[in-house]
Design a protein with these regions (language model features):
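Positively charged, phosphate-engaging catalytic surfaces used for nucleic-acid and nucleotide handling
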Residues: 1-143
Length: 143
């Protein structure tokens, strides 16, 4: 994921994209295209404040995000954009590649890929729920 992102930002540098606001703008376009949400909306959906969004994606979300960024990199190399608007178009097209994959997976599984679960909430959901009896047994063992 880190290497794919670095390849993408290297391409943006080569194609006249300025770090900071322009990178964030293109990243939002990619997220909006494949996940249907901007970075800010995605973080809000997951209940994140300062946490890193990528660190709180499911494996499916991470893979689709990587596909979106890899596709954007490939399209950028092929089209050689020179303006921010041309780079925005490449970002949208790259994100759309992952959107098609997401929609196909959702149609095959019958469930949404973009999840409100953060890493913390995901791991909490994976833990077996303790029954009232288990809690009572724990208290007995503590005595």
């Amino acid at each position: 994921s880190i290497e794919i992102r670095k390849d993408l930002t290297d391409q943006w540098k080569l194609h006249n994209v300025e770090e900071g606001v322009q990178y964030a703008s293109l990243t939002d376009i990619i997220y909006q295209a494949w996940a249907g949400r901007t970075t800010k909306e995605y973080k809000q959906y997951k209940g994140l404040k300062k946490e890193n969004l990528r660190d709180n994606m499911t494996n499916e979300e991470l893979i689709l995000n990587m596909l979106a960024e890899l596709s954007t990199t490939s399209i950028t190399k092929a089209k050689n954009p020179q303006t921010l608007d041309e780079n925005k178009q490449c970002a949208k097209e790259g994100g759309n590649v992952a959107r098609v994959a997401r929609e196909e997976l959702e149609s095959k599984t019958g469930r949404q890929v973009v999840s409100p679960l953060s890493a913390k909430r995901f791991f909490e959901a994976q833990q077996p729920k303790k029954s009232l009896e288990d809690n009572n047994n724990d208290k007995e063992e503590e005595k």
